[in-house]
Amino acid sequence: MMTQAKVGLGLRREMLDEFCQSVPGAIDFFEVAPENWMTLGGKFGRQFRQLTEKHKFFCHGLSLSIGGPEPLDTRFVKQIKTFLDHHDIEIYSEHLSYCSGKGHLYDLMPIPFTDEAVRHVARRIEQVQDILERPFILENVSFYASPASEMSECEFVSAVLEEADCRLLLDVNNIYVNSINHQYDAEAFLRAMPSERIAYLHIAGHYDEAEDLKVDTHGSEVIDPVWRLLAICYQTHGVFPTLLERDFNIPATHELLKEINKIHGYQTKALQPSHRSA
């Protein structure tokens, strides 16, 4: 099993003043959406540069549309590369979804779970990796309308990773949300993911629209069933860098640190000999 006991936090602009003064030791890395920072100048731009010079950063994109029907926006990918190079960021991930098709859709749409889609996405990933000169990492996404399917979501994710020879950002909350919304076994999905492909993890809170409908909002605390899945993930696949996502209803840093330290606790427990041999 791979051991990378690190915990990160999604960086928001409203956090810049505080973290430019001091970053808590429990935060090992930050994650940002490059689209929100690439053209940032002035005070925010200077503060962001100050942080990237001193701290580890990952990037998690929003608008690449890796599964989209239109030609890949190679100009945009080159802009991403320039941003990554400038800030010395090696990790770049995106959603296994699409957000364009005769215009921008302003949402992340699920890709049909078909062999044709697997090949289509893999070809586009090869283009991206060639331009970025970095490994490309894909995230399993939450979705609410079931796409056309020749295989399960689990089989589709695994097939894309294998065909494209790329790595996985495993979002534990998305597994839980989808398991409720689409009625499958979250633990079985988690255990079926290929350990050797995992690069890092996401964990977050969600919104309970109804008993059988969960919405991935990143706007609340992580709930117990998701914490349990995280523990199972570490026991099954090993400990990986894990990012706490909190995009809305953001509490004070000391409240975020409670969840960050909880992740550290799960990592420490999973690394104990009795758990590694389980």
UniProtKB/Swiss-Prot annotation:
Pfam families: MbnB_TglH_ChrH (PF05114). This is UPF0276 protein Shew_2240. It comes from the Bacteria. Belongs to the UPF0276 family. InterPro entries: MbnB/TglH/ChrH (IPR007801), Xyl_isomerase-like_sf (IPR036237). Coiled coil: none annotated.
